[in-house]
Amino acid sequence: MSKAGGNKGGSRTGGRGGAGSSNLHVRVKKKAGTIKESSRRWLERHLNDPYVHKSRQDGYRSRAAYKLIEINDRYNLLKKGQKIIDLGAAPGGWSQIAARIVGSTDENPQVVGIDYLHVDPLPGVILLEMDFLDDEAPQKLMDALGDKPDLVISDMAAPTTGHRRTDHLRTVHLCEVAADFAVSVLKPGGHFLTKTFQGGTENELLALLKQKFRSVHHVKPPASRAESVELYLLARDFKG
């Protein structure tokens, strides 16, 4: 699935407060007929984003890696030896983080990621290049992992249309499908983390999560841009 804002690397170092800053501000000049104003603003913001710079320095696939790092720093979700499924894995930052923290290796892979977009190989990660919404996807994920997961993570977001309510509804649908999958495969005591957009229509999703998990949290990590409507739902301690 495509990601809003570019997505998802490592140890828990480099989390909260670790993005750094620079006094150098890059401005993108607009030449007539070459670039839309909205595209120019996005590119300028991207070039001046401290998380983008830090992700390159730290060797993470994307700035979204810090979102998972920061959430994990707060809730201690990832532990050595766990098995993880990453939905909408491209470009691989969340799988990268998960594999390093849980100790996944090529000889004993404990992380499986899926995306219809190509993801370059990652150490310790099995990557499936297919749409999670395909009927065969859930079974292929379970076959690849070989056991029930301890954690299902999803940074999926539908391609944006520019219409806020439409984008919200499409992403909530992905969250609902991911949640249905999680409650059908998680180990008792497992956790589910998914991206959603603020918009007030996720009542059914929240009701499902509150029924199936012992606690549900709304989380906005510091790496999420302040102006972004993205939000994360964390459902902890699956009742089984």
Curated annotation (Swiss-Prot):
Superkingdom of the organism of origin: Bacteria
Active site positions, chain numbering: K195 (proton acceptor)
GO CC annotation: cytoplasm
Region feature (Disordered): 1-33
Residue ranges with Gly residues bias: 1-20
Function: Specifically methylates the uridine in position 2552 of 23S rRNA at the 2'-O position of the ribose in the fully assembled 50S ribosomal subunit.
Protein's name in the database: Ribosomal RNA large subunit methyltransferase E
Organism placement in taxonomy: Bacteria, Pseudomonadati, Pseudomonadota, Alphaproteobacteria, Hyphomicrobiales
